[in-house]
Amino acid sequence: MTKLALLLIRFYQRFISPGLPPACRFYPTCSEYGYEAISRYGIIKGGVLTVRRLLRCHPFHPGGYDPVP
């Protein structure tokens, strides 16, 4: 399951994201964060960290540097 999630993130990064305007308010980007979190912690904990990050990625949040813990 972890490998599938990582594959889907890479697919998004290579084929979908280049066609969209840059919108992520954070560094690293949300997809990079998700890839690293799932690689490091697995699908459950990494997935929770990724969802929490995605919920913060909106115009009313200042963004900035937010590394994977």
UniProtKB/Swiss-Prot annotation:
Protein source organism: Thermomicrobium roseum (strain ATCC 27502 / DSM 5159 / P-2)
Taxonomic path: Bacteria, Pseudomonadati, Thermomicrobiota, Thermomicrobia, Thermomicrobiales
Keyword Membrane in annotation: yes
InterPro entries named in the record: Membr_insert_effic_factor_YidD
Family stated for the protein in its record: Belongs to the UPF0161 family.
GO annotation, cellular component aspect: plasma membrane
Function of the protein: Could be involved in insertion of integral membrane proteins into the membrane.
PANTHER family recorded: MEMBRANE PROTEIN INSERTION EFFICIENCY FACTOR-RELATED
Membrane association type: Peripheral membrane protein
Pfam family for this entry, one: YidD
Subcellular location: Cell membrane
Protein name as it appears in the record: Putative membrane protein insertion efficiency factor
Keywords: Cell membrane, Membrane
